[in-house]
């Protein structure tokens, strides 16, 4: 994400950004909220007297509109964020319009009060653009999966299969060649690659990779996993391979924190989950790290709950706040625990 303008007076004002990746569109879903004013260039029908006589001739013109946000929808597979609401600035004031925000779109977001997590998201998205991207190749004999590590989770790019019963050297090399060919088309120049899987197939593939695409292969490392597919991708994250490449990776951090939380809960230790228990622990000054699901945060704000007051109290008590993605496994687990939990400085009873 690229910030093109920042004009804040205290916590009020405008920040203009350009979405550079699909991850940025996902971030914007949780930065923009109902009631915000959003400006962007868009296309809208320009009616005239002659147009009404010949409706088939009505053309859309490019205009800059400001809409008051009522609804947001992130369409991952269409690579766009749809922002819907009434027009307050520009042509056809009072009419409803939908802004389709795509990669490369510049938008201005105006808020009466920017919240800490929203400003942090923008900072994280800016920094993420400067960090290496990570691609995971999970491979075993005759089967391979390629996945991209995104902020919202793992995006499965492709599955490659070699027909069973055909493991001759020539056919095996053809299988490896297909994997390399897909990586050539899909992987950015600055990306790092984790080659994972059970057995020795991954080492054999890395050798072939080095022989055929040495520059790209120089950014690859191997990691043992018990399986391939999505479970293999998650295993790579748990084992820390992605963390070694992207030490600030949101996904790796959330996986680690969730493991800590589950371990503490299983031992009846320094953990709290559910709004009531977390608030009780906060009253004792025990909250060291607050874990909250992005959907819980968004829904709480829409319902007018005191969710931001809780976050502020955690920060005032020198605690940390981590917002989890519910599109990723740790966030799903957190959501099932009530959407909010905390790792504590000390155990709280009662």
UniProtKB/Swiss-Prot annotation:
EC number(s) from the headed UniProt entry: 3.1.-.-
Compartments where found: Cytoplasm
Coiled coil residues, start to end: none
Class of the enzyme per the UniProt entry, highest EC level: hydrolase
Domain of life: Archaea
Keywords: Cytoplasm, Endonuclease, Hydrolase, Metal-binding, Nuclease
InterPro entries: eFR1_2_sf, eRF1_1_Pelota, eRF1_2, eRF1_3, Pelota/DOM34_N, Pelota_arc, Ribosomal_eL30-like_sf, Transl-rel_pelota
Family listed: Belongs to the eukaryotic release factor 1 family. Pelota subfamily.
NCBIfam families per UniProt: pelota (TIGR00111)
Name by which UniProt lists this protein: Protein pelota homolog
